[in-house]
Amino acid sequence: MNQPNYYLLTPGPITTSRTVKEAMLNDWGSWDQDFNQVTQTVRDKLLAVANSQDTHVCVPLQGSGTFAVEATLGTLLGPQDKLLVLMNGAYGQRIANICDYLKRPYVCIDTGDYLPPDPNAVAELLRQDASITTVAVVHCETSSGILNPVEAIAEVVNGAGRKLIIDSMSAFGALPADAKKLGYAALISSANKCFEGVPGFGFALIRRDLLEQAKGNAHSLSMDLHDQWAYMEKTGQWRYTPPTHTVAAFAQALREYEEEGDAPARLARYTRNRDQLVAGMRQLGFQTLLEERWLSPVIVTFLSPADPNFDFKRFYQELKQRGFVIYPGKLTQTESFRIGCIGKIDTPEVARLLQAVKDTLIAMEISLS
């Protein structure tokens, strides 16, 4: 099958470089010392990106990013814990859903699809409910594209003597996530987002002292991050068959990440992409879901036009025929679609996308001006 190579303008999987793809051409023995060294290099680099080498450990886990979120919650939350979930989209809702499966007690602050959580409301609830031990927040809620104020939330949570878990799936690697400044108990992300690797594993950066205390908490053998970490520390190996090709590709992606200039350079490129995308789409007549101040450099949600000729399925296929894959909306109340700003793309690709959108509107006989 000769599959066309599209630009993936999504929050992950994303467009990867040819050299990242080529890194998957070799086979690796899962217990071989060479592969163990690749794993250790990856773990060390991720800790360095978060400025957390002295306080945290990196525990990779096979599967999607949600696997890593569930594993972290299941490992760190004991029966005596109660979680406050800050919810403003699908991924905050997913954390609550995981807690339902885990049978861990939780409460929510839900601010809907359009607004970030209010740190003052968080502080007030923590004052009122002494049984809350931990707070979970999504760094970038990609169902809307909103960037949540993790710095202000971290200050409130740490000031109240509670623990903070950050789902930084679509932000870590570009947005600041300094462990010393934010003081989080755990930060979770995956290979196929801002580091521009391919899907196959997620990872958690967890405070060493908390992980050491978490032995026996886990609800699942394969998702026991304490056991995964202890086994890696002892043997250098993954407990069960690792995604060898994905790890090798991620190691190459990390080399390219360093060559580009690490997080500041990546954030600058994604921000350029976002600014050009938003300006161009507005010029074509589209409106963003969010106010300017809440727009993230990861993904932007646009409102579907009211024109009766607009049909998202056709819009999607027309763009796909022109080489671009976008995302449908994930909102409950509003018809929308999403376009990502991350991956191995820069302003020339964004310009080509905008021309493709313009051509698609003409083909669909839609006028937004």
Swiss-Prot record:
Q: Which cysteines are joined by disulfide bonds?
A: none
BP GO annotations: organic phosphonate catabolic process
Which co-factor is required? pyridoxal 5'-phosphate
The protein's annotated catalytic reaction(s) are: (2-aminoethyl)phosphonate + pyruvate = phosphonoacetaldehyde + L-alanine
UniProt GO MF annotations:
2-aminoethylphosphonate-pyruvate transaminase activity
UniProt entry keywords in alphabetical sequence:
Aminotransferase, Pyridoxal phosphate, Pyruvate, Transferase
E.C. numbers = 2.6.1.37
At the top level, the lineage of the source is Bacteria
Answer whether the UniProt record assigns the keyword DNA-binding to this protein: no
Return the Gene3D superfamilies for the record: Aspartate Aminotransferase, domain 1 (3.90.1150.10), Type I PLP-dependent aspartate aminotransferase-like (Major domain) (3.40.640.10)
Keyword Disulfide bond attached: no
Sites of N6-(pyridoxal phosphate)lysine modification: 193
Classification via NCBIfam families? PhnW-AepZ (TIGR03301), PRK13479.1 (NF010006), transamin_PhnW (TIGR02326)
Assembly and partners?
A: Homodimer.
The record's family statement is: Belongs to the class-V pyridoxal-phosphate-dependent aminotransferase family. PhnW subfamily.
* Physiological role: Involved in phosphonate degradation.
Note the HAMAP family from the entry. PhnW_aminotrans_5
Question: Which named protein is this?
Answer: 2-aminoethylphosphonate--pyruvate transaminase
Q: Which gene encodes it?
A: phnW
